[in-house]
Amino acid sequence: MALISIILPTYNVEKYIARALESCINQTFKDIEIIVVDDCGNDKSIEIAKEYAIKDNRIKIIHNEENLKLLRARYEGVKVAKAPYILFLDSDDYLELDACEECVKILDENTEMICFNAYIINNAKIPIENYFTDTYSIEKFFPYLIKKDNFAWNAWGKLFKKDKLLKAFKELNLNNDKITMAEDALI
């Protein structure tokens, strides 16, 4: 069984999905599963994902019956994930090749969430401010975040314990179609 499930919601991202998948399959830590969630786009994203799935059996593709939008697409991926830890990757992003390995190095049985830094890519790698420079308990983490200026809360850039994430999803009313932005902050 994989230790980390990488959830890749997919909706009209044919321009980016190959790079995202390459960054997953080439992780230095190999004990992963990659779940591509087809959210009913109308481009070639899923055809591209299927080509990768033929070559790598760690890739699973699930198909939503209708466009569920990002939050619910992520939830569908989490529900089928086999690993105890979940990492969300937006299809237009990619992981450094040692991202999972670095997370695993600091995992222990009490780890509920690991946050890591990101880069904005223009013509050069321009790092976003280092938000996470220490280890925090949940009780100390949220007060720390509240004090940060300009903190962008995203589901990506974090490794979540699956059971805690499922609990958070169950607290939400995912049938509320009015959730169309900032859904990352709800998790």
Label the predicted regions.
Residues 12-26:
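Short, well-formed alpha-helical segments that are part of the catalytic scaffolds
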Residues 18, 43-52, 94, 98:
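Acidic helix N-cap motif at the loop->helix transition within catalytic regions
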Residues 23, 38-47, 66:
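A conserved acidic beta->alpha catalytic loop
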Residues 31-40, 60-64, 90-91:
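Short beta-strand/loop segment that forms part of the nucleotide-sugar
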Residues 64-81:
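Glycine-rich, basic loop-to-helix element that forms the pyrophosphate-binding segment
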Residues 86:
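Short aromatic/hydrophobic "clamp" motif used to bind/position activated sugar donors
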Residues 98-129:
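Conserved donor NDP-sugar-binding/catalytic core segment of glycosyltransferases
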Residues 142-187:
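Conserved nucleotide-sugar donor-binding catalytic segment
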